[in-house]
Each structure stands twice: as C-alpha cells, then as structure tokens.
Amino acid sequence: QTCALPISRHLEVTRDIAIKFNGTFGPVFTVPDAAIAEEVAVVPGLDGQKMSKSYGNTIELFGDLEETRSRIMKIVTDSTPLEAPKDPGACTIYALYKLFADESARAEMAQRYRAGGMGYGHAKKALFEALAAEFEPMRRRRAELEADPAYVEGVLRDGAAKARAEARKTLDRAREAVGIV
C-alpha cells in the first residue's frame, strides 16, 4: 500500500474506496494523500497552456534532440525587443527553464531578463541546453535498457513477484476484515 499518489482521478477513486471500506470493515487500507510539489503542479506547455498531449504542446524528453530543439525554438513569445527588460514571471520559456536549471542559473536568467539585453532566442537556447543536460543520463540509461530486453524482462518479472506478494498480504487482510477467510 502506498501513502501518496500523483493527483488524478485514480487518487480520488482510491481514496473513496479506502475510506468507505475502512469505515465499514475497519482500518485495512491506507488512505493515500496527493504527492505533488506546488511548483510543478501545472507545467506550462510550449504554447503557455497546461502541458498536455491532447494540446500538442509537449516536449518529448526522450525524443530526437533536434526535434526537441526545434519545438523549443517555436515557443511563442511576445514582440518585446532584445534590449528591453522582460518579466521572467510572465514568460513560458523561463517557467520551463526553472524546472531544469539550478538555483544560480535561474537567478542569473531572471536577472538578465530584468536587465534587458537577453532575447527570447537566447533564453530558448538556454532552456534546450538545460533540458538536454538534465535528461542526458536518463537518455543513456534508456538506451542501455533498450539494448538489453532480457534484463528488462527480468526486472519486470521480479517486480511483479514482489508486487503480488505485497498485494496478497493486503488482500488477505481485506478478506479477514470482511469475513471471507
């Protein structure tokens, strides 16, 4: 049983079932809480809306790097001139950059935006570089795993066996609480 789940309808249904069951038969299931950091509750898409596959505004983290660069370079911006100060808080590029850059890099970009002289093209390039650097180790690991499907199958088999054992314990407790032992 888990104590926290990402926010979704699954979380709501899981909570409802656990509360109803526990109220009827006693404390068997853990009632999960939402586990999502406030700063990433809504990730902006390339068009500034909430990032969503259905909106077609996503960044494919494991996709082709040139395609990713191209998509980032197409982020819609306003017509503020390069030399003019900009508000980082009102910029989709900066909102995405904050997710991948460290604190000093975020502060530096925000300062450069406010001072003027930093164009959106510069910011898009910095965003791409931060994203590529952040996900490079994961891209390498994914390539290694794709090259060894037998290993992946073994990990999945082992994980399934562990999950079945844990699920069995919970199911046994639920059966006992209901009286189906």
Language-model features: locations:
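Short, small-residue-biased leader/transition segments that mark boundaries at the very start
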Residues: 3-5
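Conserved nucleotide- and phosphate/pyrophosphate-binding catalytic cores
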Residues: 8-9, 15-181
